[in-house]
Amino acid sequence: AARRAKLKEFGADVALDSRSPDWVEEARKATGGRGVDLIVDQISGYVANANMQAAAVRGRIVNVGRLGGMKGEFDFDLHALKRIDYIGVTFRTRSVEEIREINRLMRADLLLAVETGALRLPVDSVYPFADADAAFARMRANAHFGKIVLSL
């Protein structure tokens, strides 16, 4: 609950807990029954079908993480009925040139918003490089909200 409240401080209109059995219904309610236009999925695995249930017709799901597992159930019929764009993303198979182009585009799209404060990026804590073990312990404990920074 505390993390969801913090998300609202950073501009989220609605913050849902994907572990709640009611989150799909809450997402649909928050969108007037239409469903979510864009889901950025860092969990994958066991939430794949729930994401599609929460998505709008012609919605988009971008899978950027696999914290919930590499495999899971996938309702191909629901995917087709809603005409969902399901996009997988990784940097592991990209060339250096592709990564540079993505960084260039990201800067063009986001840098001004960050500089003006329209987009705020939470930094949870800053550790000297010598205390990297403590930083990793904080991350493993999932006690942070935002980025953990190592300074040199």
Language-model-derived ranges and their functions:
Residues 1-47, 99-101:
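Adenosine-nucleotide cofactor-binding segment
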Residues 24, 28, 52-53, 77, ...:
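Solvent-exposed, non-membrane alpha-helical residues enriched in polar/charged side chains
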Residues 32, 56, 140-144:
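Short conserved AdoMet
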Residues 37-40, 60-64, 121-124:
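Short catalytic-loop micro-motif centered on adjacent basic/acidic residues
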Residues 46-118, 151-152:
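Glycine-rich phosphate-binding loop and adjacent beta-alpha segment
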Residues 111, 116-125, 133-152:
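C-terminal capping/lid region of NAD(P)-dependent oxidoreductase domains
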